[in-house]
Amino acid sequence: MQNLLLALPNELQAQVIAPLPIHTILTLRLVSKSFHTLITLNEASIARYHATNSLPAYALRLYPLPDPTAINLHYLCSIWHRLHVATKLSIMISAQATKEIFLRTTDALRLEFEPQHRRMRQRLVPLIFALFHFFETYRDLHVRHLATGGTPIHLQPFTLNPIECQVMAMYDDRTLLKVHQVFPLVMSSFSRRLRPPSYAGRVERSFKGYLKDRPADEVYATIISVGGLRQAQRFWETKGYNSRRAAVDTWYGFVTRSPVESPPKSKMSIITHLGRKKPNAAVDATTSETTAGHNSTSCNEWFCVKPACKNGRRRHSTDNLVFHSSLSAGPPMSPLPRDQLRLILPDQQHLSNIWCHSAEALILERKIVERAQDIKRTHQVLLELIRDDGTDGLDDWSAGNTADPGQTVNTEGQEGMDAPGGVSD
């Protein structure tokens, strides 16, 4: 079969491969070097086909197609990565709301509530996707502003955050209002995941093993502003409250710690270390990573920045298409280098100032609603999310899609979206 496909002309090869699901195409890259080269050489036509036929309209509005000569698999997989994160978070937020807000705690009650749960999950996806775009774009603009010598945000006398306003100017009135209304629900759901139940007293916390309180506000702000919604999803999926809190503390310590600089050597150090065996730095680094539970051979991250994985990539040849794919650019909101972290961390906003003040002011300025009281609160948003109005809640978001208007894009069931080794892994 492989020989028959590879014997076809290039145009026919592209037409055969392009309609395949994106996960299948990515798996074919691993079959052999010939298939990898075939897909790499035809990735522009593959990406154009999927952008036209499988991407939802709201994704293309926030991430427009690049120049036809620049479109590639990285653009396509980056959007599927964002959709995957939005879908995962919508599933987890809906499950939490079903259990803790709507009090559907038994299998029978959950089965009865399933239609409302499905509508809530589907309607949350485009809104959380827009939030992913906001945090990603804000971080990029913030880093660029500070790297070019701009005045830090916390030193500017502003009423509205200028970078937030610049990002929100990309959203139409309906998107801005809907995302603003759902933002408190997303943040409160994530906050609930990282703290013990509010009803649990000190004795009950000790009995159930809730050893730590909720993280500080600056930790939450750093997670969503620096790590993004993908990092929030990682913490959310960690099983066990103490394990989640330990993962948060480990990540926050890794992000905020300063690199240890070795002290300058004195003249006596030559005599002192004379005859001693010099330790191997590479072995020490590998040992420390193994001790910390990180192994480069079993790492499943798309673009891991741990030292062992980076050293493993450097050993590969530089004249081979296998190691010069567009996907080597990494996923959206990949970890920042240390020099950019030093710029952005001291300039973080307080958690209560992120999004809310600027969005509400712009909503009133654009006259999307007449009064601030007309903006729906969380309980009203939840009722709207589960309301049965005869649609799945995605019709309004599909306007302007380049695909067939009758086509429904299912990001939850897309092959490779939920399977291990999928697009975002």
Regions found by a protein language model. Name each.
Residues 1-6, 10-11, 45, 50-54, ...:
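Eukaryotic N-terminal targeting leaders
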Residues 1-2, 17-20, 109-115:
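Short interface patches used for recognition in eukaryotic signaling and trafficking proteins
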Residues 4-39:
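Short hydrophobic alpha-helical "box" of cullin-RING ligase substrate receptors
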Residues 6, 13, 102-106, 157-164, ...:
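A generic structural signal for ordered alpha-helices
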Residues 43-264, 268, 272-274:
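Charged/polar low-complexity intrinsically disordered regions
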Residues 182-425:
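Charge-dense, extended regions
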Residues 23, 36, 49-50, 74, ...:
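Histidine (H) residue identity feature
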